[in-house]
Amino acid sequence: MALPQSKLVCTVEQYLEFERQSEERHQFIDGEIFEMAGESLAHSRIGTNFIRELSTTLRGKPCEVLSPSMKIRSGPHIKGMRNTKGLFSYADCLVVCGQPLFHDDHKDVLLNPTVVVEVLSHSTQSFDRGDKFRRYQTWNESLEDYVISWQTRPRIEHFQRRPDGKWLMEFVEGLESTLRLESIDCELRLSDLYDRVEFPEDLPEEEAQFPIGSPPSY
């Protein structure tokens, strides 16, 4: 997801009231509201491809894909008007299995995602791999798969929660490869996930130092 361009300080309830009336999307991080920046064509295509492929695969199954307009809460549910703690974020694609649980009766803030997909951008990589993922790990116990998709090459960082609660990370790269999501019994071909995506001949400097098969820095 795109990172903030501006910020305000407020409570959770103030944020939700503001966000539900706003034409733009914003994330909430411990009392600060961050406006979401725009996304590239490649970013949009990858996110749309994930939604299409997962929706087709999960048709008739107990799991469903929710739109990128659904927020995710990662933090304590503290009643009262002064609560400023927690993360309210958006994903490029998300899956929930079983009965969705929500923050309130508006049913626009999900508590129990099973799969979260983020399309990596230069401005978001530290947040998506760092603080955002740590909060998901801590507060969203339902989360089984966290998927980070690069947009400059056919490469995916897949984090899977193991039965002991620890996370296993694997790289899936190359258009001939397949991403396996055990939690929803699903296999996705990277050639489908990167359909219509054009990759740059020259990688950004911070990515060029990581050739295929090597891990990025965290």
Regions flagged by a language model, labelled:
Residues 1-218:
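Gly/Pro/Ser/Thr-rich low-complexity, intrinsically disordered segments predominantly at protein N-termini
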